[in-house]
Structures are given as structure tokens and as C-alpha cells.
């Protein structure tokens, strides 16, 4: 099942239209927060307090009546304070990846995990981490081999659906994946998955 992790409307964007789309997505499957800190077209933070914006957006989503349960930081950004904010909001995090995005600098804030894990935070909270394991290209390249990870969690952007080639690759990749693994969704994993691995966020940096 597809989960919609959505960026809240930026200044000047049509909030009513956004809410209409978000409620439609919520009716179809799990809903999550996808924060872009700098601008709609610039995901990773360049200034300010990243965790404060996550809390602000999470509070707004709750105030407008949306049932949000997941988070993915734009540009795969996650630091300790953001992780604390995500845990405070009661979300499950999907920002970690099983791969290192090629555009990130070596010292960029990013969490890399192969399998689901609990993140032990300085506050004493634990955050359930369901890492993203595959891009569209990785799904397509893996068709002829086994998917060895406990959970296969692929991501794509809505703009990928407008590209004929990428949309076709996504459909083929998901179709083959469905023949090899048992379909699930993030809410089922959130409720039922209990990872055996717990790690300190302080020891999970790049």
C-alpha cells in the first residue's frame, strides 16, 4: 500500500486545495508529514531551528483534523533534535535510508540503517525507525534478484508519476515486488513490528 507523506502548504500556496488533497490521501491510506525546511524546492535546512518547524507543522496538521502517523525529513535530513520532535508528535520515522543518497556531502546529517530499529533518544523516548530501502531505480534493478531485507520500503515522488519512463518503471517494480513479498503498509508495521535492534541516536551519525 502507498502512504502519502506530504509537505504542508508554504506561504502563498492554496491551503484549502492542499487540505482537500490531504483528506483524499488520508482516505486512501496512511498519511505522513514531509518537511521541507528552506523552500518548496529546497528541502534541507539552511538556517533556523529545524525541530521547531517540525513541531509547528505537526501541531498544524493536528489542528486541521488530519490523522498523521509518519515523518520523513526532506532531503533525508534528520538530526537528534528533529528526532525528538518526531517522537514527541507520536510519529514513526521513515527518514533513514538503507543507501547513501549520492548528492549528500560526507558529513551531512543523515541516518543510514538496513533494517527497522528503535532509536534511543537522549530524552529517554524511543522512536520507531522504518528505513526507506529502495528508490524506483533500485526496485527495477532488483527484479531479477531476491529482496533480502526484512522490510522492503520503496519511495517515489508525485512528480515521478508525470514522467512516463519513471512511472512505467515504478509500476513494473512494484508489480514484481508484489510477487516476491507479502504486501503490507506502514500502519500495519507501526502497530505490529517490534524490532529487536535498539540503537542510540548519538551513535548513528554518518
Where are these regions (language model features)?
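A short acidic, often aromatic-flanked loop/helix-cap motif at beta-alpha or helix-coil junctions
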Residues: 39-41, 135-139, 190-194
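Amphipathic, non-transmembrane alpha-helical secondary structure
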Residues: 16-19, 23, 51, 55-62, ...
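Short, well-ordered coil/turn elements that cap or connect secondary structure elements
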Residues: 26-28, 88, 124, 178
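Metal-dependent polysaccharide deacetylase catalytic core of the NodB/CE4 family, i.e.
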Residues: 1-80, 103, 154
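C-terminal domain-boundary segment and adjacent tail
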Residues: 26, 147-206
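A structural signal for short, well-ordered beta-strand segments and their strand-loop junctions
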Residues: 1-2, 30-34, 70-73, 85, ...
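Active-site-adjacent pocket scaffolds in enzyme catalytic domains
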Residues: 70-154, 158
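Short, surface-exposed amphipathic charged segments that create phosphate/polyanion-binding patches used
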Residues: 47-49, 108-113, 196-206
Amino acid at each position: 500500500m502507498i502512504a502519502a507523506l506530504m509537505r504542508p502548504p508554504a506561504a502563498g500556496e492554496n491551503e484549502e486545495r492542499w487540505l482537500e488533497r490531504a483528506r483524499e490521501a488520508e482516505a486512501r491510506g496512511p498519511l505522513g508529514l514531509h518537511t521541507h525546511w528552506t523552500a518548496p524546492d529546497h528541502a534541507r535546512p539552511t538556517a533556523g531551528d529545524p525541530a521547531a518547524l517540525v513541531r509547528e507543522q505537526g501541531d498544524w496538521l493536528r489542528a486541521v483534523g488530519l490523522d498523521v502517523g509518519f515523518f520523513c525529513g526532506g532531503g533525508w535530513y534528520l538530526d537528534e533534535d528533529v528526532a525528538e520532535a518526531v517522537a514527541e508528535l507520536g510519529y514513526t520515522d521513515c527518514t533513514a535510508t538503507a543507501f547513501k543518497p549520492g548528492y549528500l556531502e560526507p558529513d551531512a546529517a543523515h541516518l543510514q540503517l538496513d533494517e527497522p530499529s528503535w532509536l534511543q533518544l537522549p530524552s529517554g523516548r524511543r522512536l520507531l525507525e522504518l528505513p526507506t530501502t529502495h528508490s524506483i531505480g533500485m526496485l527495477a534493478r532488483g527484479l531479477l534478484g531476491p529482496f533480502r531485507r526484512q522490510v522492503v520500503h520503496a519511495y517515489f515522488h508525485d512528480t515521478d508519476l508525470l514522467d512516463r519512463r519513471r512511472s512505467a518503471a515504478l509500476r513494473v517494480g512494484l508489480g514484481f515486488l508484489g510477487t516476491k513479498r507479502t504486501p503490507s503498509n506502514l500502519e500495519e508495521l507501526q502497530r505490529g513490528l517490534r524490532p529487536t535492534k535498539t540503537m542510540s541516536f548519538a551513535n548513528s551519525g554518518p
